């Protein structure tokens, strides 16, 4: 892997893409230290360490720790993710949008523009909601001296957060276009990873004071390493469906006759279902948690808190659900069967046409079942281990680990494809799932 990474840096274009990505991510981290005007950061951080403030943990995680600093990126990029989920649902139920989605590159460009506008509008609503229901509550308990809750303060918060979201979207698009990997995923990835070191140092401090057992900490680290290895193996695992192309003789030339395969991954949906699950889970927490004096709304926020059994159960269900939904969107057996028949290909032992469609659907449904169950298990296990060891860290939650591994592998896969085009050895070894054709 080190050899492959060194090879990547030897290619000027690839080196420029990697450096550009790192520079944009560094700029994103610098934004974490630009606070929203008028907000008392010390009081917010003190509140988030309490039991009541702990419910904001998942929001703080996906903002990369920006929520506890209430920087210009306090909302992170999750408003855009939520808007993307809403837009995908609308595309399936609104005929005009469905038609637009089938109009090629131009249609997708327009839908992406709608999603950006929706993300910024949602960010404006969330900024106003936080300014009025959270920051300005109880006479402005989280405001600096000289500031008071009112229209001017609300305006400042909304403008600051909208500018932050717009800047994050611009950064994400620049990474996707000129860098390596998916910009949106990498921003979430960077936000989670930078929280690891403070969490580890905090845990070491607890070990020194005797609040955390050293053996429990080592057991926790061993589990994290094993979880990484298991997730990487599953993300790479694939089932290869053999494909044979019929031979055609045209004059003195023979065309076709090659044997190849269709790779179907155990987790074909990648990291998107996990990010979508986190975005959906944040909505009720975000809407209910700011109302500290309302026991009903606090009960709702605690119910969806992923550190609680109820919230963890919902999180697992959402991961499994979105894995099925997104796999269905990504993998179309009918389109693949039509493509095979058009080019004279067939799966040995399976007739072309409808039998091929049903065969591929059967294979995908089985792989998706095991892949979804694995993702659900990995979402669940870290929380159980944290409860057993007494080491509680939202940064090392199952959903956080899944996103880190998924985004890292997707990015390495893009780098590898660039290396393979230039006849270099890649990063990743291929996993294989052996099975019968039926």
Swiss-Prot record:
Full protein name: Protein translocase subunit SecY
Lineage of source species: Bacteria, Thermotogati, Deinococcota, Deinococci, Thermales
Bilayer disposition of the protein: Multi-pass membrane protein
SUPFAM superfamilies linked: Preprotein translocase SecY subunit (SSF103491)
PANTHER family linked to this entry: SECY/SEC61-ALPHA FAMILY MEMBER (PTHR10906)
UniProt-listed InterPro entries: SecY (IPR026593), SecY/SEC61-alpha (IPR002208), SecY_CS (IPR030659), SecY_dom_sf (IPR023201)
Side Periplasmic, residues: 35-56, 131-157, 202-214, 289-303, 390-392
Subcellular location, record wording: Cell inner membrane
Domain of life: Bacteria
Ranges annotated as spanning the membrane: 19-34, 57-87, 115-130, 158-175, 183-201, 215-231, 272-288, 304-323, 373-389, 393-408
Family matches, as Pfam families: SecY
GO cellular component terms attached to this protein's record: plasma membrane
Cytoplasmic side stretches: 1-18, 88-114, 176-182, 232-271, 324-372, 409-438
Stated family: Belongs to the SecY/SEC61-alpha family.
Function: The central subunit of the protein translocation channel SecYEG. Consists of two halves formed by TMs 1-5 and 6-10. These two domains form a lateral gate at the front which open onto the bilayer between TMs 2 and 7, and are clamped together by SecE at the back. The channel is closed by both a pore ring composed of hydrophobic SecY resides and a short helix (helix 2A) on the extracellular side of the membrane which forms a plug. The plug probably moves laterally to allow the channel to open. The ring and the pore may move independently.
GO BP terms: intracellular protein transmembrane transport; protein targeting; protein transport by the Sec complex
Location (main, coarse): membrane
Keywords: Cell inner membrane, Cell membrane, Membrane, Protein transport, Translocation, Transmembrane, Transmembrane helix, Transport
Quaternary structure, from the entry: Component of the Sec protein translocase complex. Heterotrimer consisting of SecY, SecE and SecG subunits. The heterotrimers can form oligomers, although 1 heterotrimer is thought to be able to translocate proteins. Interacts with the ribosome. Interacts with SecDF, and other proteins may be involved. Interacts with SecA.
Intramembrane residue numbers: 57-67, 68-71, 72-87
